[in-house]
Amino acid sequence: MSILSRAANKLQPGKTLLVPKNKFKVADEEWGHLPEYVVPAANKIVHPFYQYPNATERTALCITERNPKLFNGKPVLPAFVRHPVTSESTLVESRLSFDTVKDVSKWVQRIHKSGDRLFHKVNITSSDSGPKVRKTKLTSESPFVKQLDNFLNSHPQLSFETLDSELSKLFIFHKGQEVIYLEEIFLYILQRDNLTVPQWKATLKTLPKYVGKEIDDIDMLNTLLIQWVLSGEQLFTKIDTPALNLLWNVIKSSRESLNQNIITNLNNVQLDKLFDTFLKGKDIKVSRILLETLASRRIMPSLPSIEEYIELVGQAGQETDAGIVPLERKSKLYLLHVLSPVFASNLTCRMTDLLLPYCIHQSEIFALLDLALKSKYSKDIAKSCVNNFVLRIAQLKDSQVDNSLNISSLYYRIKAYNNGTVPNANLLAFIIALLTNSNFRAVQTIINEQPVKEITKVIEVVKNQTTFIDQFGFTGVDRETLLHFLNNRA
């Protein structure tokens, strides 16, 4: 009985007053005293590349007595929280703002542990690996096969009703003469060199009738499904959406017939092949299901496939009364969350460029930069993507002063990464970014540290920059001083 209950009993002897349990309070051993609808639990944050607060952010949180916050208290990190009334789990862009410093330390420890678990090592599938399906056991000498070939050759435009009817007749007729398994018949049809598109579709449409009956081996069923995909790729450049919908419906119906999960029984190579197939068909829903199954095995698709998935998420939309509209940022980040282990160690240039537009706060940009510079492809990223980081951070805020501070922080990180020298390919980008934000003094400091080759271009940009958004910080005098400095260097 709680302390409140015992106190109430003392006030009213002989009566028992039960104080209802607060269903929103989470056990202290889980993550602290803060209800989820105020601050999300550490393991409910689903950001794909922001692992946890860096050292500077952690220090700022823990030394701020009143109202410590991350991301300036703005809703940035996608997270699942429990609704304060319905208690339903809801995806939101959460505000990480605390009333006091009291519970911050525990929360920071838990998000750090959660991030370490999330960003574990995974095995990346090779892009040139693929499933191999054994040849059918049926041979051309079989009387059954000869009769089946004659039928298929004379029916190139085959419906599944006709195929089903003919298979039943042939199977019954030859059953007493030779041992024939129905799954071998389907495999034989799909492996024929002169297979037609109608025959290919009819084979899959006929299959569910026999699953759980004549075909009750889930491994054999998976072999047939993969062979159907491989045969389809020989017939088309890409399997179309109706055919993929048919395949997914067969997978779902087979699960019910066999009372087994078809997807979880696929081996890693088969699962990766299905993911790649639905990805090429731009089916984001099924692709995500297959990707999460791979991730649960600590397996990831090839890096080109991952890049294609990120692009697909970026294009994803949802149906509304007003038609199809783009998915919200929080939903897209949630769809990318499963790729966190890849971003932690195998971030590529293409991935970096695709993820940058999701950054709406400088902490996200620097979190992505940290992963980029730790990646095994860091040299390529540093060579190709730094200017995109500069462009993104230079336009992040309305305040030219705030933008300048962020540009300077990025400049010194890149300088440290390159052992004290910013590459010329990036130097001009930093200078133009600072000029765009009217920070003329910082430009002069940079050029004093490291001369710039395109001095004429810098002078031209300075002359064109006449807008001062901030009421303080940068002035026209600074601009004239810089022009004089540059003209002396030209």
From Swiss-Prot:
Its GO CC terms are: mitochondrion
Q: Which InterPro entries match?
A: Aep1
An annotated Gene Ontology molecular function:
translation regulator activity
This protein's major location comes to mitochondrion
Q: Name one Pfam family in it.
A: AEP1
Q: State the compartments where it is located.
A: Mitochondrion
* Disulfide pattern: none
User: Which keywords annotate this record?
Assistant: Mitochondrion, Transit peptide, Translation regulation
Role noted for this protein: Required for translation of the mitochondrial OLI1 transcript encoding subunit 9 of mitochondrial ATP synthase.
Q: What family does the Swiss-Prot or TrEMBL record give for this protein? A: Belongs to the AEP1 family.
Q: What is the designated name of this protein?
A: ATPase expression protein 1, mitochondrial
Species annotation: Kluyveromyces lactis (strain ATCC 8585 / CBS 2359 / DSM 70799 / NBRC 1267 / NRRL Y-1140 / WM37) (Yeast)
Highest classification ranks of the organism = Eukaryota, Fungi, Dikarya, Ascomycota, Saccharomycotina
